[in-house]
Amino acid sequence: MEKITISTEFIKLDSFLKYVSAVASGGEAKIRIAEGEVKVNGEVCTMRGKKIHPGDIVELDGNQFEAVGK
């Protein structure tokens, strides 16, 4: 699992996926989230505006990313 430092209180799920280079664009993030391919803390999440806080774990294509604070 890769730890990803975020410098704000939260980051939206679609922006997080772009930030960690799990997707190539915001459009791809929107589609992948809408199709139920993304998990947040082990549960499928279809809300691209979902707030990701430090401690949350995002999973896509078998890759896991943990958001951590500064």
Task: State where each predicted segment sits.
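A basic, amphipathic helix-loop patch mediating RNA/tRNA/ribosome contacts
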Residues: 9, 13-54
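A positively charged, amphipathic N-terminal helix/segment that binds anionic biomolecules
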Residues: 3, 57-70
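Secondary-structure boundary/capping motif
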Residues: 1, 40-44, 67
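A detector for short, charged/polar N-terminal pre-domain segments
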Residues: 1-11
